[in-house]
Amino acid sequence: MSNKPESLAAAFIGHLTYERRLSPLTCTSYARDIRVLLKYLSGSDLAQVQLPAIRQVIAQLHGKGLSSKSLSRMLSAWRGFYHYLIRDHHFKHNPCTSVRVPKSAQRLPHALSPDETAQLLNFVSNDMLAARDKAMFELFYSSGLRLAELTQLKPADVNYEEGTVRVLGKGGKERIIPVGEQA
């Protein structure tokens, strides 16, 4: 195995995909975050990177407007990458362990008002796709499903007699959700 940063990153993503069996979206996010690290540390020996270099990268990204949440997720990926390098590639230290991300004010998500929701759901169409979309909007609004969960639903997941839908959530957890009358 090469000690080139790109090879180490590819091996890490392979580890996440095939050994830890993380979801494809999670692996894609980790890969993107590791590419950012490699871009900022371009030309550096990953085994020799120290805490000040990681802090500098975080400061630069924060200065470019990345949110604390994005920086925290990114730093978590970097910590995991270095943890993997220590365990599988005999690196000596993790320069990311004591880095803290600048905190920002937490904002509540914007929710649709009842009027906005009614406007969204009160369209009339004889088109089959429009009927499907309306049912999806209604289910999404009334059930609290994640968008990824909604898009993965199959007709076989719907129990019309009981008025429920079987959802495969994060971590492969299955749950049964009641379906509102409108959906």
Where do the model's predicted regions map?
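Conserved catalytic core of the tyrosine transesterase superfamily
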Residues: 1-183
